[in-house]
Regions:
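Active-site nucleophile elbow and catalytic-triad environment of alpha/beta-hydrolase enzymes
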Residues: 41-61, 66
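Short alpha-helix in the alpha/beta-hydrolase fold that links the catalytic acid
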Residues: 66, 80-89
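C-terminal alpha-helix
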Residues: 120-124
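Acidic catalytic loop of the alpha/beta-hydrolase fold
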Residues: 75-79, 106-108
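Catalytic histidine-centered segment of alpha/beta-hydrolase-like enzymes
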Residues: 104-116
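Catalytic histidine neighborhood in serine/cysteine hydrolases
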Residues: 91-107
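Short beta-strand/loop motif that positions the catalytic acidic residue
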Residues: 63-64, 70-72, 76
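Hydrolase active-site cap/lid region
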Residues: 1-47
Length: 126
């Protein structure tokens, strides 16, 4: 398993819980919410939110021994680093490694970040 700035349950944890009550009411009424992030707008449908609630994983244990590699930017302001740490806890039997990228943001799109990602993927595949 490779997680890059992983955000399971992001609809609830990173969107719904941060909305004000009036925004939640409007979301429920219109059946969608226009999320603004980093200069972009994303249409989040209510059906997507409800589907995400059916697929929660952070309250379970995954007893697989598959290797778990997580990489997370230290300056990620979209997904908190504590979420990657929480992911670690759901894999009690796995061999785990987390790399925190100094200066890395959520996209990890600097050339050095992309090289680091490519090297990690190559290690897992080969």
């Amino acid at each position: 398993f490779i997680g890059i700035g992983s955000a399971p349950e992001f609809l609830d944890r990173l969107i719904w819980q941060k909305l004000k009550n009036n925004e939640k009411k409007l979301f429920l009424k219109k059946k969608f919410y226009m999320l603004k992030s980093d200069g972009y707008e994303y249409k989040i449908k209510l059906a997507f939110l409800k589907d995400g609630r059916k697929n929660k994983v952070l309250n379970k244990k995954i007893n697989s021994k598959i290797p778990v590699f997580l990489i997370h930017g230290k300056k990620d302001d979209v997904v908190p680093l504590k979420l990657s740490r929480k992911i670690f806890s759901i894999f009690p039997r796995a061999k785990k490694k987390m790399e925190i990228v100094k200066g890395g943001d959520h996209s990890l799109s600097r050339k050095g970040d992309l090289n680091r990602l490519a090297n990690l993927i190559n290690k897992v595949i080969y």
